[in-house]
Amino acid sequence: YASDASSATQTFNARLFDPHTNRYDRGSMTANAMPLAIGLVPEDRRAAVLSNLVADIRAHGNHVTAGDVGFHYVVRALMENDRGDVLFDLLSRTDAPSYGNQLAQGATALTEAWDANPRNSQNHFMLGHAETWLYGGLGGIRIDFDRPAWSRIRIAPQTVAGVDSASARYRSVLGDIATTWLRSGARLRLHVEVPPGATAQIELPTSKASEITESGVGLRRARGILRVSASDSRRVTVVVGSGSYDFEIPDIT
């Protein structure tokens, strides 16, 4: 299967990727977002393809041109590449095409078409992909059963300008997973609940592990902390066992 996957990826890129423009096919949002979301873009081209996707969204006034099939990949591509700021701008629009416009047209459920026109269904879930980011990005709760057991639950909230707090709760097969965060200036407080018998990998937006506290004490002395490491220059990763945790970061990245 690994060999087939590698062969399919190479064929896909050979036929659809333009190395001169760093775009797929005709460069639409869906064309660039889908390969980013499912891992088909060569590692040394990911940043450039992402940049093209973001530029396309900005050029359309923070509107999306993707429909039911493609919007899912746009959300995933931006979320997995830490561009929650772009998603927030996109989801905050009130003119068509947008969720805000659906509300302005009197919708009480998701409509089939972005412009909420009465010719289409007025109760249709096909454009509901934004909740992927609300739970997985803004709330920061993600589960991946392909990962090692200790990191299947990943907590990585994406704080964005314009949002000072958020909370999310997900009833998974492992038990309830919950997060609540509050930002005041550069200070961030994050509450996390990990279900019994599980562990979680928590990514905190700072490069200074020594400044992070959990329930008022440093990470090295806090109960339930199994591992502390620097993911990169912008994150500290903390692995914890089951229980409730209250982190505080005085200066987020």
Each model region followed by its residue ranges:
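Catalytic cores of carbohydrate-active enzymes
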Residues: 1-122
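Non-catalytic C-terminal accessory modules of carbohydrate-active enzymes
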Residues: 85-253
